Amino acid sequence: QVRRYEEQKLVKKYEQWEFVRLILDDNGECRGIVAQNMYDMRMEAFTADAVILATGGLGMVFGRSTNGTISTGSAASIAYQQGSIFGNGEFIQIHPTALPGEDKRRLMSESARGEGGRIWTYKDGKPWYFLEEWYPAYGNLVPRDIAARAIFKVCTEMGLGLNGQNLVNLDLTHLDPKEIDRKLGAIIEIYENFVGEDPRKVPMKIFPSMHYSMGGLWTDYGH
């Protein structure tokens, strides 16, 4: 939607600028922002009748997450320090199946389990489908919080991660490759690009990751 307004010259985009602080009047009302040009470090004030902070989550607080690397939570932190209310910060969504990476973690969608993917690791030298054993009524379709806790327990408490690492298998190799491509093509491509292995033939290596921050700056009809 914003691009459409840009084309009509109704919106001006400032790229490579960093939000520094809010501009507050004597009554504590927000009247604009101060931002810094990251090319020349110049500061500039932008006054406005209203300010909308659409700055993403806080995934980088966790080091690595499925969020973009610019999701630092810094804008919300600045607003909080200037008097805004930050609510429900304890509600952090953990996704059970993510691909670890040097820069961030990449989401391996739950649709993989929905289409028949199985999670397992080795126990006593044999494949162990621990979700199916612990939760026989649901198996690999347990809710994401239960799946994430189970994987975390297997790796960190039981020490049964693959090759001693915090990893377990998300296995699609028993499924029809054509159906995998049709229904899961996006995550297959991501995994192949970043790992160099074919999930149709080799199980994917995954671990839970911070995914979404459900809380944030408090908004209501007065804010």
Task: Please provide the spans of the model-predicted regions.
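Hydrophobic alpha-helical segments, especially N-terminal targeting/anchoring helices
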Residues: L24, N37, Q82, W120-K123, ...
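Structured mid-domain segments that build the active-site/substrate or prosthetic-cofactor binding neighborhood
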Residues: R200, F207-H223
